[in-house]
Amino acid sequence: MATAVETEACQPTDASWESGGGGDDEMKQALPELESSQQNGGGGGLNIAEPSGGAGREENAGAEAAQSLSHEQPQDSSEAGAAALPRGPEEPERPVRRSFQIPRKSREKKALFQPLTPGSREFEDVVNILHSSYLEPTSVTNFNYRRACLVHNELLEKEFTEKRRELKFDGRLDKELSESYAFLMVDRYQVQTICEKGLHVGQSKITILGSPSMGVYLSRYADLLQANPLDTGAMGDVVIFKIMKGKIKSIYDPMGVKSLESMLNKSALDPTPKHECHVSKNANRITSLLAYRAYELTQYYFYEYGFDELRRRPRHVCPYAVVSFTYKDDIQTPKFVPSSRSNSFNTDRNIDKYNYTLWKGQLLNKGKLLCYISLRSATRAFLPIKLPEKLDVETVMSIDHLKQKIPPALFYKETYLGPNEVLKNGMYCSLYEVVEKTRIGSNMESLLQKLDREKLVLVKPLGDRGYLFLLSPYQMVPPYEYQTAKSRVLHALFLFQEPRSIVTSQKGSTNAAPQERHESMPDVLKIAQFLQFSLIQCRKEFKNISAINFHSVVEKYVSEFFKRGFGSGKREFIMFPYDSRLDDKKFLYSAPRNKSHIDTCLHAYIFRPEVYQLPICKLKELFEENRKLQQFSPLSDYEGQEEEMNGTKMKFGKRNNSRGEAIISGKQRSSHSLDYDKDRVKELINLIQCRKKSVGGDSDTEDMRSKTVLKRKLEDLPENMRKLAKTSNLSENCHLYEESPQPIGSLGHDADLRRQQQDTCNSGIADIHRLFNWLSETLANARHSDASLTDTVNKALGLSTDDAYEELRQKHEYELNSTPDKKDYEQPTCAKVENAQFKGTQSLLLEVDATSKYSVAISTSEVGTDHKLHLKEDPNLISVNNFEDCSLCPSVPIEHGFRRQQSKSNNVEETEIHWKLIPITGGNARSPEDQLGKHGEKQTPGMKSPEEQLVCVPPQEAFPNDPRVINRQRSSDYQFPSSPFTDTLKGTTEDDVLTGQVEEQCVPAAEAEPPAVSETTERTVLGEYNLFSRKIEEILKQKNVSYVSTVSTPIFSTQEKMKRLSEFIYSKTSKAGVQEFVDGLHEKLNTIIIKASAKGGNLPPVSPNDSGAKIASNPLERHVIPVSSSDFNNKHLLEPLCSDPLKDTNSDEQHSTSALTEVEMNQPQHATELMVTSDHIVPGDMAREPVEETTKSPSDVNISAQPALSNFISQLEPEVFNSLVKIMKDVQKNTVKFYIHEEEESVLCKEIKEYLIKLGNTECHPEQFLERRSKLDKLLIIIQNEDIAGFIHKIPGLVTLKKLPCVSFAGVDSLDDVKNHTYNELFVSGGFIVSDESILNPEVVTVENLKNFLTFLEELSTPEGKWQWKVHCKFQKKLKELGRLNAKALSLLTLLNVYQKKHLVEILSYHNCDSQTRNAPELDCLIRLQAQNIQQRHIVFLTEKNIKMLSSYTDNGIVVATAEDFMQNFKNLVGYHNSITEENLPQLGANENLESQSALLENDEKDEEDMSLDSGDEISHIEVCSNFHSEIWEKETKGSRGTDQKKNTQIELQSSPDVQNSLLEDKTYLDSEERTSIDIVCSEGENSNSTEQDSYSNFQVYHSQLNMSHQFSHFNVLTHQTFLGTPYALSSSQSQENENYFLSAYTESLDRDKSPPPLSWGKSDSSRPYSQEK
């Protein structure tokens, strides 16, 4: 932003321009600061100095100017007046000059500026050029030209001549080559730059003739130099340019045309090729300087085209001279001045009336001096703020913009007639005059002119929230008043938000000020109340107060003030309102006051100010202390007491969170409003005391009674409490733990779980309601809890059971909200608890409200121990360990994820509990002792190992991003032998996880319960679930986590499933033990090994100590998927599953990881043990089916017949086995096929083919690939770069190939491009759209439809995949023509132009299609556009015509669709189009249902783009299947194909034995270098053949998604960027990025669980806006 005070930083432009010898006295008097101040038509004239060489040099310069002017006279008719320049006074001297000619100096030695002496012939020539270019002849009397100089720039003059020569060579007319002059008024600091470097584009803001960024604007007339008329006395500098107009194009005035065509069409503002100048067609109509828009309409617009772009400086514009002028206007000002304005400030008339000079100093701009100024006032004796000696102003604002922020009335001088501050709209204002201290300079004048001309205001921020504005006097004149005379002063306007002075005012005149101050300063008034009270009280005993203890006396009375405010019995002090009538009284007291002590007080006040200060912190302490006195109650006498129960200390203290305090205070107010019954209170106290003595004595009661305040400081708490407060702000409550059962209510809703070790759990509870909760629990545990006593407690506290429950509920909600604020939390949806430990056999107890009907005790035990809790008999207790058959959905198992210490560790460590809510109901069947005893004696077959009794995990880490899985993997004390799925997830952070993972789905399991109980349970669970889900969503919104709500309600199927909630599950579990399961597993594996040995083959043993890199050369097996003991329960296997397809699936998922642990634990005793790769229920007879049923490829691998195979497998560590699995996945990714597209045989294609085949890759025709491809197959299509334009559209099935992400395209020039990965990637991502005339037909398309389409396109386009609409210029031109008469067409055109600026719409240049005789776009045009935009993957042709007639378009790789179909069925039409954010678009194959594909598969196939054609080592291509994905595939087919659940279950059971069989066929080791591939094809039934192929394809896709660790670097893995050759290792960061893909898979599976019926789902899915799918 240009400012009048910024420009002093500019350096002097030129020695001859800034200083010198000659000149008149006026110019010599100019201050040096003027040269650095910004001028634009104002400011003191040019400081042009004459050279000191004497008259000879001067006359020589004049002679040169005359010679140059003699052949540079204007030839244009508009400059005809310049041809006859007056020479009369100089005629007698010419003969003399001819006889004394001085030799011309070389042009190289000339300075940039050649000064001209006023009165010389050269000076007159320049003036005549100006006079001849006036619009009005009367302007001659208004302009006074004081200084002039010629500009000599050899470079610019040479380019000017070259431009003229070029135009002449092009055959231009002499009229076009004629030279004339144009003018530009510039600021002083710009003169040097323009004359040195020429006039560059961008110097103007006018747009009437063309874009100012592409050309330059110059004035045609020398007296029309700016848009506004010049003011009298204005000074400025004019640069005269020598110009060649060239070929001129006349431009219509866009404001004069009714249609907005020119404004909407950006190309209308562009320069015209083959032209050099634009002029307005209305320029000849301008006949007066005061005509409307005269300045804009009389401009020249010059530009110049280079070879392919516009030049930044047109060469046919050359600076010729610079002239300094002064403007004087003959118009007389009105003599009549209204009498009402006679009191307004006028510097010239009233300059002597200013009595006060309030400040003198320097006005600076960015540290540089502008001028010396002073501030004066006639009525005000003080400034509102102390100003420094140097006032540095750096900010400038537009006066119009400022008046939008501040009321315009503040800028009228008549507002400030009085002596006082003016209060307007809450602002206190005062006005002063700023005058220049000396009369020798003109910087103030030039500054005034600059501010007037550009309507600017100087702004200086001040302290105390104030501002200083320096304004021109013209800006202080009301719009209806005329400024009578030129002023030489500025106005200084001070604005503050608070009053700056104390004034004695007349009666009633100050009512407004205090009132407004009262509204704007409430906090100050609050402080003033107790200060006034304190000072009034101090004044009563002022003689007795020494200066030393004055502040302590004030503190005493401030404390008393607060006591009165909180109802201590004394009357509350009320400050009387301010009475303005007392301002007029000189003496407020009738008698004189005693002031004998004033000297001592003043001395102390000056030299010891700290005595008279009251710190805010001290004030807060006083406030808190006195407020607590009111909150004290009889019950709170004991809330600071410390009690011991079973070695556990329980303390009540301060909550760490402010919100908690607010909730507490609200509850306290409600309770204190009731009267306490003293008898009941005593009864409660006696109960507490009795319980305290019976538990642990009363040793520290007296000590704790000294700490009866509600909110203790942190340092008063014990050490372990301080640790708790430091580690977590969630430590708001401390729950009491005993060996006796604690009641649990609210169906386990309370999230605040705590674990203890020894006696270390202390936390504060800050109100009597928690005291009530603890008391109720204590009474219940002591068997003293009956209905009457509970009611007594409730009534004594004024609280109902519902209130207590609601309070606990609010506390839980708050904890959920505050949980994600902690960085300690691994997931945003997990509640975390600090300082909770275990030791020995202490149980984890879930504590919630004591009013619940049912309760649960959870027992724990160390590994290898038989410790158990001895619970008291209570038929309402039920052990969570017995909920084995309680079927949960995979997203919400009963899972707490405890991390345990090792048995030998006695250290206290912080642990985490990641929890989920589960519905629990109690039964009345048996006592807990019986249950626990049975579990201690014999472990239930369905139970996990002792280490995992409390852990219910999903199978095979079905959802690896689940917070529970991550928590287990991070455990350092207890490690799960995780599966290959979970190994890749150990770096996942909370940002990678969306909360779709925490949806609760509670599926109750078996046996009947009365309908009323079932409905109650269901309602309760749904209520708790909805509350939990809502809070989680609020947390996500606070954290700005992008989350699409896919919440599904818990599934309650039949009454049959509700039965099991009321039965002890141990009676329903299988009798098979863990050891029996392991023995059976060994027998099965031995049978498999013996059958495999019959095939023959060799498999050398490998030492378990071999590194992963060595074992990598011996790939065995698929990755291991453990099987739980429930897999052998044939009863459950064969029962119908159609009623609840999730039930058994989830049951399996609960046991999978535990089975893996069991297998690992039992390895030392069973040397031949192997983990089974089936996650599904496998009947015994199905497991013994012959292996020959599975179809094999002809190149089956021989399996080792040696018995060493079993030993080798048994010796493998799980980590080694997992590494082998990852290696297999790496090998699987290297199965890449290629196709070389060539029209004619070439040597290059033959070399590339031989090279790729040598690497082990196979050639595959695209049609064969589409017919037979599997999900893991990848295809690379290679074409020579020179063939792209002519033949790439002839690739077979190009449209279908583009839809698949596993297909990539490469353009090569040589074999080295393949070897060195320097090929050109083709069809990478995104796409573009081409339409015909029907899409933009105003009769067919509405504005709303077009807007929807463009919005869809905008949402579709991303940085990774850009989409664009390419419109033929023929259609745009037609819209322009229609827009002149048709408003709808104009709206369409306007909308199109808006998106053109966003680069979403591109107007194609004119080409063959745009001919009137041809229909655009033609097929050849689309093919050419496809080749030109080779990086964009898709080309879509939109039309509203019959699509069936355009089948030939599809054969050439072009998608044809209507606009509506494009938006509704985008994913079906286009498929893959974005390499980064491809989340919801399906995979499209030749034999697949396009609408039924899962977004999960597409996410998986992102990694399949990492395609490799060289197989590194000589490893066979083994396609690995994962059984887990049969579940996902099952859910997909349920949602997309519309099959019923029973059929899906049957397919699942059919796939299980095939997976078992695949175990036999995938154990491979090759001694030879043969490359073979084992393709698993299921032939289990005729109808399931193709279906199960899809299933295995899904498995393979999901497998390929997982990344390999760095130890497999000897495998060659190629991406689009690294196509062939060099192997590389995947970094951990890449692995972590790919882990994010699990997220969408997790969410997608949950989506299907809650989706509507398959047909309607598919329909609604296809119609969803793409913006929601991305």
Curated annotation (Swiss-Prot):
Residues annotated with Phosphothreonine modification: 982, 1049
Feature: compositional bias, Polar residues: 67-78, 1546-1558, 1659-1670
Biased composition (Basic and acidic residues): 927-938, 1532-1545
Keywords on record: Acetylation, Chromosome, Isopeptide bond, Nucleus, Phosphoprotein, Repressor, Transcription, Transcription regulation, Ubl conjugation
GO cellular component: heterochromatin; nucleoplasm
Gene Ontology BP, a term: anterior/posterior axis specification, embryo
Signal peptide residue numbers: none
Positions of region (Disordered): 1-110, 921-947, 1532-1558, 1638-1670
Residue intervals passing through the bilayer: none
Pfam families, per the entry: DUF3715 (PF12509), PIN_TASOR (PF24630), TASOR_alpha-beta (PF23314)
MF-aspect GO terms: chromatin binding; RNA binding
Annotated positions of the Phosphoserine modification: 344, 633, 636, 673, 800, 843, 927, 971, 979, 1103, 1552
Crosslink site: Glycyl lysine isopeptide (Lys-Gly) (interchain with G-Cter in SUMO2): 586, 823, 832, 872
Annotated compartments: Nucleus; Chromosome
Residue list for modification N-acetylalanine: 2
Family: Belongs to the TASOR family.
Functional note: Component of the HUSH complex, a multiprotein complex that mediates epigenetic repression. The HUSH complex is recruited to genomic loci rich in H3K9me3 and is required to maintain transcriptional silencing by promoting recruitment of SETDB1, a histone methyltransferase that mediates further deposition of H3K9me3, as well as MORC2. Also represses L1 retrotransposons in collaboration with MORC2 and, probably, SETDB1, the silencing is dependent of repressive epigenetic modifications, such as H3K9me3 mark.
The protein's assembly and partners: Component of the HUSH complex; at least composed of TASOR, PPHLN1 and MPHOSPH8. Interacts with MORC2; the interaction associateS MORC2 with the HUSH complex which recruits MORC2 to heterochromatic loci. Interacts with ZNF638; leading to recruitment of the HUSH complex to unintegrated retroviral DNA. Interacts with INPP5A, EML1, SV1L, GPSM2, ITGB3BP, CNTN1, ETFA, PSMD8, S100A10, MPHOSPH8, TMEM100, ALB, PARPBP, HCFC2, NCBP1 and SETDB1.
Protein's recorded name: Protein TASOR
Organism from which the protein derives: Homo sapiens (Human)
